[in-house]
């Protein structure tokens, strides 16, 4: 019985993921009436693939889309504040700088953080993030392994509990720079650390962004995930709970889950194996589409492999579709839909890429211009222009992608940089750097096979 009580205490004392605060701080009393007078609902969040991000100039994120639907129902504009230091989320909430925390929060005892949790919007177990290949297959294999986690996170507490529960010695390392979980996943993918822990919902998204990771080892039972609110926001909590309890049973929520967690890109077959005289399943289509465009068909093929693995029926995160993953609004602009033929999709893609290429006509070197085009296709032009301005400030060349703007775009995840006045579009995860690099790896491989 004593062991069971210790277990319950360890579970309930799971804190919000790095959202620490000073318990002596008094919170501002702000509820729905004042929010309505202010005329907007403010969400404090992280720049992550699950909570909030911008992709191809569209605001996305599983939690963002839930709260966007809620705000529309309340007839309130939604304002997003990205907080780079996750340990400040609760402080900013209590200070009245935002009304809701959206950061994939595990539900814990409210008095641990002195905030309230909404009704859960999802539940997800914790899983081990490791690289493919020499992976471990059981929790016992974590003995003597080094696992990096966020300070005071539910992941740290879970690993400590596993040590006591099954008698193993895990070398738990707290990453001092206050990263978000996705930063640690990226470090695993790059081989800089071997293991970290994440909730399975974020891990499912991440394994399609980071090709080297495995997320199959489950470390816990499903944990409830919710939004965080001030204690004083009684009416806001009542309205949001009512909305969530209805929304999670709706077809709209079912479709939202499909778009983020069950999309087909993650279940594509093994990469097409080039055969003699044929590099891809659609060589002739690629060759036909690039005629008179100045583009190498192998480069367009590399984009298609990276985007969909040559699957014209692929559906991606946020609703993207097709062989080169058009966002729905962009597809409508270019006259295509998920039912369009491969050649129609490629023709539209070529028009889009050629138009984007024209936007970068001040880049003198053609290869570099192509890389800027690919980067803006992935991230949206605004983030890449931010990276150019930042590159200039850092004494890098704003007209060269390799080792210059490429470096600057990675710095846009850091608040020391994305809060600079020259940065117009805010925080960005930096995925464009990896996107461009991967496409050129595929492209160079195709050229070597010629």
Language model: regions and residue ranges:
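Periplasmic-binding protein-like
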Residues: 45-48, 120-133, 200-242, 263-271, ...
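Catalytic and substrate-binding regions of cell-wall glycan-acting enzymes that process beta-1,4-linked
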Residues: 374-445
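Bilobed "Venus flytrap"/periplasmic-binding protein-like clamshell domains
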Residues: 42-51, 56-72, 106, 127-179, ...
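Extracytoplasmic small-molecule ligand-binding "clamshell" domains
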Residues: 21-105, 109, 113, 172-179, ...
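Extended ligand-binding regions for polar small-molecule ligands
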Residues: 20-26, 64-73, 132-154, 200-202, ...
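A ligand-binding cleft/hinge motif common to bilobed small-molecule-binding domains
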Residues: 87, 103-113, 160-165, 186-221, ...
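Substrate-binding/active-site groove segments that recognize
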Residues: 313-337, 342-355, 439
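Export/targeting segments at the very N-terminus of extracytoplasmic proteins
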Residues: 262-310, 343-346, 360-361
């Amino acid at each position: 019985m004593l062991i069971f009580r210790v277990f319950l205490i360890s579970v309930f004392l799971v804190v919000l993921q790095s959202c620490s605060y000073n318990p002596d701080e008094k919170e501002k009393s702000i509820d729905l009436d004042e929010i309505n007078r202010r005329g907007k609902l403010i969400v404090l969040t992280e720049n992550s693939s699950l909570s909030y991000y911008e992709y191809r100039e569209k605001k996305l994120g599983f939690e963002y889309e839930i709260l966007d639907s809620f705000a529309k129902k309340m007839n309130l504009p939604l304002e997003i504040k990205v907080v780079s230091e996750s340990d400040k989320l609760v402080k900013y909430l209590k200070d009245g700088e935002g009304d809701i925390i959206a950061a994939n929060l595990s539900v814990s005892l409210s008095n641990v953080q002195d905030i309230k949790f909404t009704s859960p919007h999802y539940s997800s177990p914790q899983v081990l993030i490791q690289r493919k290949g020499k992976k471990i297959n059981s929790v016992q294999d974590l003995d003597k392994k080094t696992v990096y986690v966020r300070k005071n996170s539910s992941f740290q507490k879970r690993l400590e509990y596993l040590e006591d529960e099954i008698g193993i010695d895990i070398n738990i390392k707290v990453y001092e720079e206050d990263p978000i979980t996705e930063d640690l996943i990226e470090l695993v993918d790059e081989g800089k650390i071997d293991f970290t822990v994440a909730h399975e919902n974020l891990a499912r998204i991440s394994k399609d962004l980071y090709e080297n990771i495995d997320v199959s080892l489950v470390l816990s039972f499903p944990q409830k995930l919710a939004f965080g609110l001030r204690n004083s926001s009684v009416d806001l909590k009542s309205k949001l709970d009512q909305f969530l309890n209805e929304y999670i049973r709706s077809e709209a929520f079912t479709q939202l889950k499909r778009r983020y967690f069950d999309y087909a890109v993650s279940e594509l077959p093994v990469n097409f194996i080039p055969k003699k005289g044929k590099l891809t399943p659609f060589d002739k289509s690629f060759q036909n589409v690039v005629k008179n465009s100045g583009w190498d068909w192998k480069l367009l093929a590399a984009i298609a492999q990276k985007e969909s693995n040559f699957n014209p029926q692929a559906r991606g995160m946020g609703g993207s579709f097709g062989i080169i993953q058009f966002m729905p609004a962009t597809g409508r602009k270019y006259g295509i839909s998920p039912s369009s033929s491969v050649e129609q999709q490629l023709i539209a893609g070529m028009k889009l890429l050629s138009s984007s290429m024209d936007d970068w006509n001040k880049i003198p070197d053609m290869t570099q211009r192509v890389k800027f085009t690919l980067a803006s296709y992935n991230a949206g032009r605004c983030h890449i222009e931010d990276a150019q301005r930042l590159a200039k400030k850092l004494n890098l060349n704003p007209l060269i992608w390799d080792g210059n703007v490429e470096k600057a775009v990675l710095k846009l995840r850091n608040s020391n940089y994305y809060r600079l006045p020259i940065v117009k579009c805010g925080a960005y995860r930096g995925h464009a750097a990896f996107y461009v690099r991967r496409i050129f790896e595929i492209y160079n491989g195709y050229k070597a096979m010629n």
